[in-house]
Amino acid sequence: MNDLWELRTGRRQKIAINTRQATASLRSGTYLKMEDTPVPNGRNVVMGTYPAKHGRWSYIHCNFPNHRAAALKVLGVAEDRDAVTKAIAQWDALELEEAIIAAGGAGGMVRTMAEWAQHPQGMAIAGLPLMEIVKIADSPAEPLPKGERPLSGVRVLDLTRVIAGPTCARTLAEHGAEVLKITGKHLPSLGRQEYDTGHGKLSAHLDLREAKDVEILRGLVRKADVFSQGYRPGTLGNRGFTPEALAQLRPGIVVVSLCAFSHAGPWASRRGFDTVVQTVSGITHRQGEVFPGAVPGPQFYPVSAIDFLTGYLMAFGASVALARRTREGGSWLVRISLAQVGRWLVQRGEVPAAELTNVAKEFTPEELERWKMTSNTPVGRLQHLAPVVQMSETPAYWDKPTVPLGYHQPVWPAQTS
């Protein structure tokens, strides 16, 4: 953001970040309150890790109804945790992983980090950088739109779901971008996450199974600066929205592309989430060794670190690409995956064991009160965490509250010159 501000004004700003507040932002949904009542987390009762045969563990991801139905169909049981526990105990963990994926579900076998390092997908991820920012087409250099904030006038199409991708667009919005979130009315959603990541955005429904809605999206692309998408490789491409096609529609566009396991390797098209990546890559196994729970076994991070850090890195990548477009022109592709960020996070190392004793489970009430703000949304008064990054000339803020999905029409607001 500072680089973009310097391109606008020739000045750089002073940046301040409270690291404890930044840590809280990795579990921001925990602190949501609607009309002073905590917003439920929506976690499904059967989602989690279970002992399988031969001393191994399996994880099933069940927050979305279709993924839950797929897992339960494979297991042949109803939505009951005891029944799921008994069923998974009869399965080989690797065979269950493959069966659930084949059925259209999400989950995986708990691996060690050493096992993941030898897995074909783990090796593919190891050959990639944290993210890639590549020029995919030539076009003239473009000055940033006029405005008083780093991203004023920059239009962002947000075709992402869950946490990471929506966090990217939310971050761009807090620095002045005009964000239009596009999702399908037919797609399942998770209420709390939408409340948490919807700040600063317009929201509209389009059904890309319908030709007329595809044309509407094409029209929106022609007037966009950033196209952020979080579907599995090929999903939008099959509807005519490959990065190259987007660059033809709108020369100079920045395409931000997120998936679970990267564009490389045998799992390139496999669905996945933060917790799935933790499971298969050895993170939950190692967490279980360092922080054993009441029942021995794998443990997840206490925050959604991979999801949120991926979102922040996507926003960083988009900003870098916009700066390059300003200086040298061109259309740009920012490519990143949850698995790449998970690997990068593990490479940061571990906190020494001596520093892991007597760690508080929560921030103080006084801290949380300082970090919170209240927004008046169409469905009530929402208390949530405020932006973390402090900039000396252009304070970060959202100029719109979170709204229900599909609240607006799929059109760009008129821009003032």
Language-model region placement:
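Glycine-rich phosphate-binding loop and adjoining beta1-alpha1-beta2 segment
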Residues: 177, 181-208, 212, 216
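Short, well-ordered alpha-helix to beta-strand connector turns
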Residues: 176, 200-201, 224, 273
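A structured beta-alpha segment of the ubiquitous adenosine-cofactor-binding alpha/beta core
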Residues: 157, 202-248
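Acyl-CoA thioester-binding alpha/beta core of soluble enzymes
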Residues: 1-186, 214, 218, 222-223, ...
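Rossmann-fold NAD(P)-binding glycine/threonine-rich loop
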Residues: 238-285
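Domain-scale recognition of functional cores that engage charged ligands
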Residues: 166-167, 177, 192, 206-208, ...
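Short, hinge-like loop/turn segments at secondary-structure boundaries
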Residues: 126-127, 197-200, 271-276
